[in-house]
């Protein structure tokens, strides 16, 4: 889908979630080379000029968080051949997103906060060297709000369950990278969600087709299982 628009002129103006969440950066990195780098950087700059002063969409839901995550994770690629001036602009855009994410986090109701928001907020607090500790109890409450007592994501959709579990792993890795203690709630949630996810696989490796279940997503879901053991073995 991203391939269908990424080479179009001014694609940053297209009203698509793949544009507004900056997922195109991941495609551009795979594309690589000067074309991919220039395409990514200039699209971010143009998008920001167009949308920075808007109040609602595309600053709604968790789009701000997803853009921030994609920019940070692709930072080296985006800036690999940047001038000092271009790098300064990139940093300003990222900083703008951090402050916007923090503002939205305080304003959102607890059931409106996604696992992508948790990653974005954690990155923002730690990079900006703000007090992460005072947010831990609230983050624990957010996790509790989204997982039931059996360790199942409350969407009761295996794909959403796997996405949430993946993001908890990512949250843990970020905290470890910044030498920050991982809350027990995150550790325990990873353990119980892994255990619950294992229960849903048939003996032939397929998943039950209910409430969004789709065997096209089996690899994504299986990739979430026991990721802890995989990462320790690397």
Predicted regions mapped to residue ranges:
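Carbohydrate-active enzyme catalytic cores, enriched for enzymes
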Residues: 152-234
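Extreme N-terminal leader/anchor segments
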Residues: 1-13
